[in-house]
Amino acid sequence: PHVASGGAWKARAAPIRLQAKVALGLYPLPERTPLNPVITGRVDRGDYTVENVSIETHPGYFLYGNLYRPKLKTDRKVPAILNPHGHWAEGRLVNRKEGSVPARCINFAKRGMVAFAYDMFGYNDTKQAGDHRTYANDLVSQLWGINLMGLQTWNSIRALDFLETLPEVDRSRLACTGGSGGGTQTFMLGLVDDRLAAQAPCVMVSH
């Protein structure tokens, strides 16, 4: 239906958000338990740094990624961008001429923004609950009580929570961008979480 104003869109969006959360198994949202972030392995590249991160998105379930931070010369707060990856063998470490998640995050950091590249379920370091192709295909996986898209979206929500804990981050300027499956994750996060000031899903499910 035609939406004539911002207010009309907010009214239209509310039931869409609710329907999406129900379909994802995220209604009501799970409890936001402590993230217990661990940041290690700092590498200094001159005008930016790269660190390894783990956060506990569910009790006993850990999400891993890399945090790219600019070397700031002032105390001003900066934007922060989530960078979910697509269905590529290398996951968040993909570095090809067609596209590179590390290069994208380095670019953001060099432009004065914090960037967090984190694993899709079953990739790289985030494999403790199985593979994304077979998740919930067996009774043990189903004991988690959440579907794959819901789990991935919850990981994105908690990754956004993590960015909000960083002292240099401007919480009013949070964003998300990704390609392919990362574009789908960007789309879904923006659908259920209104904290994003900007989102750029690329080559995702609707194309």
Ranges and model annotations:
Residues 1-69:
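Non-catalytic accessory segments flanking enzyme active sites
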Residues 50-52, 62-67, 94, 100-103, ...:
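Short alpha-helical segments and helix-capping/turn motifs at coil-helix boundaries
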Residues 41, 53-54, 103-104, 163, ...:
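Generic recognition of flexible, low-complexity loop/linker segments
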Residues 74-165, 205:
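Cap/lid segment of the alpha/beta-hydrolase catalytic domain
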Residues 158-207:
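Primarily recognizes the serine-hydrolase "nucleophile elbow" in alpha/beta-hydrolase
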Residues 55-59, 69-71, 86-88, 122, ...:
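Short, flexible loop/turn elements at secondary-structure junctions
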Residues 62-63, 79, 197:
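Glycine-rich phosphate/pyrophosphate-binding loop shared by adenosine-nucleotide-utilizing enzymes
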